[in-house]
Amino acid sequence: MEKDKKTWSGRFSEPVAQLVQRYTASIGFDYRLAEYDIQGSLAHARMLAATGIIQPADLAAIEQGLAQIREEISKGEFEWQLEQEDVHLNIERRLTALTGDAGKKLHTARSRNDQVATDIRLYLRTAIDEIIDLIHTLQYVLLDLAEQQAATIMPGFTHLQVAQPVSFGHHLLAYHEMLQRDGQRLQDCRKRVNQLPLGAAALAGTSYPVDRAMVAYELGFDDICHNSLDAVSDRDFAIEFCACAALIMMHLSRLSEELILWMNPAFGFIRLADRFCTGSSIMPQKKNPDVPELVRGKTGRINGHLVALLTLMKSQPLAYNKDNQEDKEPLFDTVDTLKDTLTIYADMLAGLHVNPEAMRQAALRGYATATDLADYLVKKGIPFRDAHEAVAQAVRFAESKACDLSELSLADLRQFSEVIEQDVFEVLTLEGSLQSRNHPGGTAPEQVREAICRARSQLPG
């Protein structure tokens, strides 16, 4: 094949304009599908030989040629040509140069439409498996840190105001639970990714006696796509993955926001290792939490990719349209960003320095045991709404004295309810508050440790 000649140029009277060639080419980004394109081509060629569509000698030549191409790509010696448009035609051009007529037969019973859909599914299946492993790694880091901090007391917040004492380990376990659901969603998404489009050809199937089940088995697909139009035209599997990725990034963005707050000297709850921070070009004292900030920022980009893919597909008639070429860059960047974020996060949390005393003092400053006092009154027979009102008045009184509820005298507390006795001070301690939530899902250290054991049992060894 001539270098500048297109595989489809037979019915055209003039060459493609240079600007159009650059505008429509995808080789600048879809080259990363090369390994999956080769895998799909090998399986397709073996099926063609098994069904008698090509000869065994053709298959041998194709296998040898694709092996050489794979090696050239791995060594960086493969010549990617813009005029060949995409990864598929670049590989076919080289294969034909190496094998002659055998290479020209490879595309029998196949279109680039079902070819690229297969490549993307193979790529995404691998990416999902890698991302799930990275999620598990991060979960183990969270569990290790939660175990170390099971009895560390921090203020729990609502509306970013001190609400009730919680274990820092319990707080970290909340993110483990989010990631657990994230992993489950990806596992479920993988089922719909793992279906074979090859055999759908351009849109209507093929008149050749292909064995789609053979190809599916060789490539590790659970099933074939059962409608040829759907197989080549939809990208809902990629959209679903990007939705899963957006949820993961949203969860990590929430944790990032907390790390940024906790690192602020006004909180002083944690320190990030220097390797995850940067300084200021003008302020010598600055240690900026760039990694959490970028996670927060990159979450917006991942959300944008999801919307881009939804918008890409929303008005396309069946079947394949060139619009679908625009599916790859958002998908690739989503995969890359998510993998990098999970990898960095596991390392960053593993080196987190915790300041338990700062957390404790923050809990003491916010009347975090006020609900415990209300519950104490209820257990003494006071209706909850009356107890709520009495404690609200007690908090206001403590504020006027610039002290915590636990620092008020018994006489002071009895101003607000005569049922209060000396035992009230047991429930007004931070430790007492934690211990009282001793039920599954609660923040008592004992429950936190049991939750960690249960969580470990659910993760792969």
Curated annotation (Swiss-Prot):
It holds the Pfam family ASL_C2. GO terms for cellular component: cytosol. Coiled coil: none annotated. Its EC number is 4.3.2.1. The keyword Amino-acid biosynthesis applies. It comes from the Bacteria. GO terms for molecular function: argininosuccinate lyase activity. PROSITE patterns: FUMARATE_LYASES. Belongs to the lyase 1 family. Argininosuccinate lyase subfamily. NCBIfam families: argH. This is Argininosuccinate lyase. It comes from Nitrosomonas europaea (strain ATCC 19718 / CIP 103999 / KCTC 2705 / NBRC 14298).
